[in-house]
């Protein structure tokens, strides 16, 4: 259990400290002036004790150890000699660039007409059918639906005469 740096009566688990500090900082922003430790942001110290804390902070050892340790030395086993290549693919200009649209139009791939207007979509689908089934593909005409008998009968509202006032 740890205590809140703003109010010693607040006691909580260490994992809840950061969340609690954010709340207390808003509440006590005008009354208590605390400085944040450069090694651990959960350490909030009054200004007179700040210098002493930075000298004796337990999280300072991580930084000091990093600063005083010798840099890593690569052994000869891990160094690789530079390999020179005889060919450079960037210099070869005889090969055309890859174009995915051209590839898809030639390969046996089903493409989707995304982002097209309805008329363009119908033309695209028709073109794709011709591409997949060959040039001898004939467009199948969809038969129109015949009107049902119920559609041919007049509704009761069609035979009514316009409303006239009684006299």
Curated annotation (Swiss-Prot):
GO terms for molecular function: tRNA binding; zinc ion binding. A zinc finger (CHHC U11-48K-type) spans 1-28, 34-61. Signal peptide: none annotated. Zn(2+) 1 binds at residues 4, 10, 20, 24. The keyword Secreted does not apply. The zinc fingers are required for transcriptional silencing activity. This is Gametocyte-specific factor 1 homolog. It comes from Drosophila melanogaster. The gene is arx.
